[in-house]
Amino acid sequence: MTSKNKIELLTEHLIKIISETNGISLADTLELAVMGDSKSDHPLIKKSIQEFRRLINDFHSDEIDIKTLLNHPVSQALFGFFKRFPRPYIEEHIHLTGSLSAEFIHPHLMKLLEGPDRRIYFSIIDKVYGPGCAENIKTVSDVDQLIRLKEDEFFDRYLKILLLPKLILTTKEMHAAAAYHMARELYNKYNVGMIRLKFTLSRATQSSDEQIPGLENLTEEDVVLGLYDGFMAFKKKVPEFDFVLSPCFRKEEDFFDATKFKTKKEHFLHQVDAILELLEKYPFLNPYLCEVDTVGSEKDLFRKGHFAQMQQGFRKLHFKGFSIRSHHGETWHTLKRGVQAVDNALNIWHIDALEHGLSLGINPNFYFHSLYRRLIVDNERGAKVKVGSSDWKELMDMDWREHTSIREKLISGDPLLESERREFVKVKFHTAREVEHYQHDVLNRMIHKGVGLIALPSSNNKLTNSFSDYKDHPFSWWEKKGLKLGVGTDNYITLNTNYIQELLILLFTDAENLKITKLLMVATGETRRPYLSQLLWKMRGHSTHKS
C-alpha cells in the first residue's frame, strides 16, 4: 500500500466515524475507530490509528512535540477531512505581507533587484538580513528562506522579516495581483472561503528601515481599490468566496508621516477621513470596507493616555457603522499590563473584537509560581536577575510594601533567608490573585458585550515566550468559558503554518474535551448543529475536493 493510498483510506475511515458520532472529541473518535474486530477493518489502518493515539498521549506528557503529530499519516488524514468539509472556513485574522508565497514574491522582487534602483534595494535588504544578502537572492528557494521565521527568532525579528513583500507592494496593480493570489491559494489549498484581510492603509513612517522606494506615490485609494479588484476577480470565478478589507493602523508613536503631519493623531484622523471619502466616492466598497484594526508592538502602550491619540478617529468610524478590532494582549512587559492594555482597548476604543488576547488566557497562579520557582533556583546558585529582563520587570511591578529588600536581594543574587522566601511566596500569591481577578473582570465584560476573541495558536507560540508549548494555548478554556471565538493564522507563510494546521493544533491540544463539531462551528461560523450533522454525513464516499 502506498503512502497516498494509506492516507486516503484513513481519511475515509475517519469521515465515517466522525459522521456517525456527530463530531465528538478526537480522543473518543480515535478510540471508536479501533474498537472491535470487524471483517471490514484494514489492519494497517487500525495499527496507524493506535500508534497515533499513543503519540497524542506522549505529546501531552512532553515526550514528543507537535511536529511529530502533524507529520503522522493520521494527522494528514485529518487534514484531508477538514479540507473536504463542505462548508468553507472563515480566516478571521490574516495579514497581506506575511501571507504571500515565495513563488509570488520572487519574480516581482527580482525585477527590483535587477533594475536601475537595485543598490537602494540591496541596502534596505542588507540592513535587515546582513551584508551581501541581497546580491545572493537568485531563486524562489532563496526568497522562501528569507520570509520564514526561524525556530530561534521571535516577535521583534518577525516584524522585520516582513520586508520583502513590502518592497513589491508599491502599486495598485501589485495589490490586486497579491489579493487574487492569496484568495486562490487559501480557497484551493485550505478550504478558506472568507478572508478578513489585515493590511496597511498607509506605510508612512519615520523609521529609516521602512523607507521604501515608490511608497511616496502609493495612495490609500490605490491600496484599497487594488485589493478589492483582486478579491473581486477571484469572487467572479468562485461566487461563494467572500472577504472583508480591514485597514490596520500601527499603534507605535513614531508610525506616522512626519513630513506631512505634526502628530500621529493628525495623521490618523486624515486616514479615517480618507476611508470615509473612499466609501462616498466608491459606494460599492461599503459591504467590504467596514472595519479597521490596530497592529504593532504594544509593550509600551498600555495606559489610558496611550489610547488617546486614536480615540477620536475610532469614535468617528463607530458612528459611521464600522467595527473596531484590535491586536492586544499579545506581548507585554508584565502580565498585568497585558491585561490592562485589553481593558483600555475595551473601555476607550470600544473594540468589537480582540485579536490574540493571550494575556487573558495565561493562568496567573501558574505564571507567577513558575516565576517564583525559577528565581528561587537561580538565587540558590547566586545568579542575578538581569536588569530589563521579563523576570526583572515582573519583580519591579509587584507590590512589595516594606519588603523591597527581598526584591533587591533577588536581583543582586544574594541568598534569601527562609523567612524571606515565605514573604516572596506571599507577594507573588497576592499579585497572581489580583491579576486573576482583573482577567476575569475583563473576560466577563467581553462575554456580556459579545466582543469576539480571535485565537492564533502558532503566532502566539512562536512570537511570545508566554507559554512553552502549543498544548498550553487557552483556546479550550476560552471556549468553555463561553467566549465568542474565531481562528486566524496571522502571517501563515512567515510562521510556517496554514489554516487547517491551526485547526489540527487546537484539536490535538485538547483531544479529550474539544469536540470536532464545536471546532467546525467556530471555523465556519455555522451554529446550526443539525445542519452541520447533515454536512458531515454528506462527506461519506465523496473523495472529490478542491485542487
Question: Locations of the language-model features?
Answer:
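Metal-cofactor-binding active-site regions of metalloenzymes
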Residues: 2-547
